Amino acid sequence: MHDIHFLFVILWQINKNIMDIVQIKDKKFRISIPESVIKERVKAVAQRINHDMAGKNPLMLAVLNGSFIFAADLMREITIPCEISFVKLASYEGTTSTGKITEVIGINEDLQGRTIVIVEDIVDTGLTMQRMVETLGTRNPESIHICSLLVKPEKLKVELDIEYAAMNIPNDFIVGYGLDYDQQGRNLRDIYTVID
């Protein structure tokens, strides 16, 4: 009986290790942030927003496509009155930020006098976020706050006040939990780092 249990444990570990690596197109990725850690960090960020934004009815502006899962999970943890809308900006092709920022879907809400929280999946160079803050600033909001699931501090090219960062990560290319590699991998529950 002990041998069967031991064999089961070995097979489970082999299967787990196989599941830790995924292939997306021409690249392999390994789990770097498990779903349980992501959920904890999202909840912690939401609690800070609940505390800081109480009585302000913030407008959460989720940046598509990458932040849709983060935004949904974050909103489930927000307990204060708030609204949500979506904007789409692009600066990525494949695994590299192009620096070219194109507004695809605009903002229709009146932002004058509003408290705005930009909800982003990842702040990489910061160029996209800087452009977003500048664009929103022309609409006279009361304040603009940045909330990002992930931040790559060593890759930032501009100074940003990211008040609500769930996690700082190294300068690696990642997928999962809404982040993609050429539009694939967004559906993965964990976050994976490229290994080749």
What are these regions (language model features)?
Residues 2-196:
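PRPP-associated nucleotide enzymes
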